[in-house]
Amino acid sequence: MKNYLCLTALLVAGCFAQGQAQDMHYKEPPKEIKEIALAKLPPTVLVSKDGKWLMELDNVPFLDVAELAKPEYKLGGTRVTDIFGPSRREGYSALHLRNVETKQTFEIAGLPSNMNILEAEWAPGSSRIALILREADGLYLWMVNVANKQAKQISKRKMNRTASQPGPMRGMNPAIRASWVNDSVLIVPAVPQHLGAMPTPPSAPSGPVIQVSDGKAAPARTYQDLLKNPYDEQLFDYLFTAQLVKVEPNKETELGQPAIYLQTTLSPDRQMLLTTTIEKPYSYLVARASFPKRTCVLDLEGKLIKEVDKQPMTADIMGYDTTNPFPRSFGWRADKPATLYWTEAQDEGDPRKHKVEFMDAVYQWAAPFTGEKQLVVKTPFRCRSIDWCDDQFALVNEYSRANRRMKISSFVPLAPEKGLQTLFDVSTDDNYADPGRPYKTSNQYHQSVVYTNKQHSELLMIAPGGSPEGDMPYLSRYDLKKKTNTILWRCQAPYYETIVDVVDPAKLQLITARQSNSEPVNYFWRDVKRKKNV
């Protein structure tokens, strides 16, 4: 019996010893695995507006443990941090400039060591670069002077980038990025001054969360990271509210009142600001983009010029080709100094209930917004986007999810009665038939417009080039009259090569990125007409 008791005591003592806290640390893998995991990634390359410079950004391969351990707030369908930025965004660890002509690479002086660049944006005149740097206590605005290769912080205010969502530049939503007024003046969303401390969670709920049904059965999507209670609403207000600030050399001006922004876009003439803001009441069933919203035009002092639209909460819409019954997709015409355009459903957003010839219509409204809206074009399918050129030529991209079709058509903005001229009508399931996208150039307003000749008879198309051998991207010339496509340049096996930019469309000079199974990404200057590669 005594032996049994002793054995039991030893076992219990062993269990307690095993249950004690231990000083554990993360361990590193073997050298070979570590080298593979931390191998340097190819840089992200952004071409300057004038085509003379490459901005090379070194990608961060992984987030470190300290970043992963930071609190993450899931609000309105978005994940953000307490420093008013997107959660778990890798960013960039270094920035270099490369001269396209000389191929010389330049280091940028003045940037902090161990920096993390969250966003980078060329100025319209290519003389400067705006940066958002992530530091331990917040996000800060910096500027790079391309001429002297110097960088400096240009505002002590913390930036608010909670509205920033993944996009073409790995974390930039074009709707809410920094807006260049000129090469030295920016409009940015900042953290409001005197904001106070972050709300603290209640010790107990103050009451139940009540949801009201209108008695009608309806399908609904399920989203993650939605608001769940009044405390989430307080956090949403605190973290997403931003103050627009005009940052000039040695001067900062607040524009209007703090608000929760979905969109801030400068007019092409840089005299007005289109804003879409979120208003209460919020919803626990849909993401923030479906909350009540107000769209306005402001001047550059923040004063209201015109309220363009106001919408209630839009319930989630289910079904092929269904859409918001309210005006949507507000923007500025790229070829005009200050003309708004938007899309309106002609079938109340539901083609199953309302059979119409045209699902959508696009309207425009020119500043000073005292006249009536004007029809620009009607589309049989849903309007996805418009690529502007001028009053005589534009392209509309439309789609039908129900029919799994995509169409690209041309039209005359000045004469909507002429209707559409279909250029491409393909199945969205047919990769081989994907026509790609039209090449766009910069106009007098530093806006991207469709590149074509004076007769509007030709386009340059950049296509993914789906084929039995895989994607083989190409550049082609499309004849608008004959509706024929001539390939001018194409990726050649065993490489995968994509077009980074068309530096000179008239001379057919390109910058491409080429890689293979054994070669990392490298960049080339290609003169298609002369068949020269550098």
Model-found features: residue ranges?
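Bacterial Sec-dependent N-terminal signal peptides
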Residues: 1-23
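Beta-propeller folds
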Residues: 17-529
